[in-house]
Amino acid sequence: MKSLSPPRRQPIAIALALATGASCSALRAQRMEEQPAAQIQMEPIVITGDPQLERLNDEELFSAGESAFAAHDYRAAARYFDRLVDFHPDSKHLRSATYNAGLAHEKNGDFEDALSRFSLVADPARGTGDALDAAFRQAEALYHLGRYADAIAILTELGARADLTEGERLQAQVQRGVCEVEDGRLEAAEATFRRVLTAYQATDDRGLVDDFYPAQAQFFLGEIYRLRYQMVSLDPNQGVDELAKDLEYKAELLLSAQGHYLRVIRMGNRYWSTASGERIGGLYESLYQHLVSSPVPKELEEEEAQIYRQELRKKIRVLITKAINVYERTLEAAERVGAANPFVERTRESLQKMKELLIADAQIDDEPQTAN
C-alpha cells in the first residue's frame, strides 16, 4: 500500500512570526525540588509500548492509521503508525508507515517526533518520491525547531540537484532563504532570493512553474527591507538635522520594501498578493506610529514646536489616508479572487483602526470651530 503523500505545499514560514521581526525564546521546564525517594514494591512488568494496540497486527495498524489520518484524527494516526514502526520492523508497510507517522506528527505540531520519522526516509542527495518529500519535510521540521543551519544544509543540497524540476529547485532555494532570514543572515537571504527570481525570469516556459515560490521570494525581499526599516530608530534628541536624515533613510527603506510588495501583487499569486497588500498598509501605519509617538526636538522654540506639530499632523494624515487606500484595495482584490488567509483578517482589523484614527483627526480640526 502507498503512503499518504499529501501535496508538498508546506512553505517554510508563511511565517507570521516575521510580523514582529522578533523571535521567541523556547521555554525550559524548571526542575522541581528533589524530594526523598519513597520505595514502592511492585511486581515486575514488561513494557509493550501501547497496550491498547498490542493485539493489532501490522496490516490492521496500517489500515487504522490511514483511516484516522483521513478522518483528521492525527494523534490516533500517529499512535497506529508509530506502533507499526516500533514493533513490526519486518512489515512490508514499514517505510510507508514511517513516512506517514512523520506526516501525522507534523499535523500535530510535534516537530521533534516528525523529524525523527522523516529522517529515516529522507534522502536529500538522490531521493525521489517519498524520500524526496521527506527531505523537504525534514527541513520544515528543523525550521520549526529553530535549527536553521541544519535546515539550510538540506535545502542547499536539494536546491542544487539538476535532476529535480525547476519548481522543486526554486522551492528549496526559497525555503533556504527564509531560514536565512530567521537566522538573522539578511544579506545572504537577499542574495538567495535574488538568485531565485533571476532563475525564474530565465525559465523558458514560466507557465509550467508554479508562481507560489517566486512570489514568496519577492515577498521576502520586501520583508528584508521592512526589517531594515524597523531597525532605524527616530531619536529627536540628536537634533533636527540628524532626525531629518534618519527619517529620509527610513522612508527610503519603506519605499524599497513597498516596491518589492508591489512586484508581488503584479505577479498575481493571490496568497502573496494579499499578504503584500497587508504589508504595504502596515508600513504606512508603522511610520504613522513612529511619527505620532516621537516627541518634539528639544532645540525648537515654542513657536517652532507648534509649527513642527502642525506639519507633522499633515504628514500623519497623509500616511493614514494612504494606509486606508491600500487596505481597501487589498480587501477588494481578496474578495474578487476569493482569498481567505490570516492576512485578510488582519487587513480588515487594520483598516477599521485607520478609519477610526482619521475620524479622530478630523474631530480635532472641528474643535476650534465648535468652541467659536
Predicted feature residues:
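Bacterial N-terminal signal peptides that target proteins for export
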Residues: 2-14
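Acidic, polar-rich low-complexity tracts and alpha-helical solenoid repeat scaffolds
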Residues: 4, 24-372
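Bacterial N-terminal signal peptides
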Residues: 13-23
